[in-house]
Design a protein with these regions (language model features):
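Terminal-region recognition feature
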Residues: 1-179, 183-189
Length: 189
């Protein structure tokens, strides 16, 4: 049993709740901008007979199961991410969901945004995901279509980006399954 002294009908609780709901709605609106940014590429994807990254994720997940997005605002207003028209979320969709009844970490290159090119904060997002995988012994599924490193920012990601490849070897050594499905180009990785 969890004991709490919170008085949910108190004026201060109601005010805190209202203030937090405003912030949550602002957060969700930013997440929606990322999704909308990716969806602008839909005509290109349709022409190539491809699904958008968000649709790939939906097709992968068990029907009626949940997906917990992680680090969805990675890189907010850093580098090329202006927080508005070019909001990127680290150029990937990452989170925990169920595939064939198994709880997994899923990472989807968001190739609808700048070809899924990797950014500094996208690398940090992937490294944080690897920590969660190791701690919770979650299988990793990656849906990959990426232009590789953003060449204009390559010096910012080269060293830390290499750690993501080392993490794959560590996961393998730990007996944690890793699966990558490549949907198009996968430059340098």
């Amino acid at each position: 049993k969890f004991d709490s002294k919170i008085m949910i009908n108190s004026k201060s609780f109601k005010q805190n709740e209202a203030d937090h709901l405003v912030l949550i709605n602002e957060f969700r609106a930013l997440e929606q901008k990322i999704s909308d940014n990716s969806a602008r590429a839909k005509p290109k994807f349709d022409k190539r007979g491809q699904l958008l990254p968000s649709a790939r994720l939906k097709a992968l997940l068990d029907p009626d199961s949940y997906f917990i997005p992680l680090s969805s605002l990675a890189g907010y207003k850093i580098g090329d991410d202006d927080g508005d028209k070019n909001i990127m979320g680290g150029n990937s969709i990452s989170g925990i969901g169920y595939v064939s009844g198994v709880r997994c970490m899923i990472n989807v290159s968001d190739s609808g945004i700048k070809g899924g090119s990797m950014t500094q904060m996208g690398v940090e997002k992937a490294l944080r995901g690897a920590d969660i995988i190791k701690e919770n012994k979650l299988p990793l599924i990656s849906l990959v279509e990426s232009a590789g490193a953003n060449l204009l920012r390559q010096s910012e990601i080269f060293i830390r980006g290499g750690k993501s490849f080392a993490n794959l070897a560590k996961l393998s050594a730990m007996g944690i399954p890793t699966v990558a499905v490549v949907h198009g180009s996968s430059t340098a990785g």
